[in-house]
Design a protein with these regions (language model features):
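A short, N-terminal "cap"/entry segment at the start of jelly-roll beta-barrel domains
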Residues: 1-35, 120-121
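Conserved short histidine dyad/triad with adjacent acidic residue
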Residues: 24-26, 39-54, 93
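Short histidine-centered beta-strand/loop micro-motifs
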Residues: 28, 48-54, 71-72, 80-81, ...
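Short, conserved beta-strand element in jelly-roll/cupin
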Residues: 40-44, 54-69, 112
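Histidine-centered metal-chelating micro-motifs
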Residues: 47-50, 68, 88-89, 93-99
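Short acidic-glycine-tyrosine-enriched beta hairpin
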Residues: 74-93
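Ligand-binding loop in jelly-roll beta-barrel domains
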Residues: 84-85, 93-118
Length: 121
């Protein structure tokens, strides 16, 4: 068993993330993991990510506050949705994704992401 207390969770920097604090809860520098890692992002009012693709599948669960998530699959129009506590969203590998905190309160979101992209089919 590997326990990471929130007070001990290492902070990490993610590219194109603005007005956000990103903490590693499990995996990578937070401890052993074989297939995925968990992170917690604390997003200030007005904080956001870029609308960027990733080769990794990503799963988000809003823990606190409200976030607007936008996804865009190549060749399709972008789709946005507002998530509130315990709402979740999955982004497919290669799908562009953006998180924006349009509210006046801090938002917290849990991220689960594999270490490696899916194998070629």
């Amino acid at each position: 068993m590997n326990v990471t207390r929130i007070s001990d969770a290492p902070e990490y920097q993610a590219p194109n993330h603005h007005d956000m604090t990103c903490l590693r809860l499990q995996g990578r520098e937070a401890g052993p993991a074989e297939q995925l890692w968990l992170g917690l992002s604390v997003i200030a009012p007005g904080g956001h990510t870029g609308l960027d693709p990733s080769p990794m599948e990503k799963h988000y669960v809003v823990i606190e506050g409200e976030l607007t998530l936008t996804g865009e699959v190549p060749g399709q129009s972008a789709q946005s949705v507002v998530l509130r506590p315990l709402d979740s969203c999955r982004f497919a590998p290669g799908e562009k994704r953006q998180l924006v905190n349009h509210s006046n309160s801090v938002a917290k979101v849990l991220l689960a992401m594999p270490f490696d992209p899916p194998a070629a089919k």
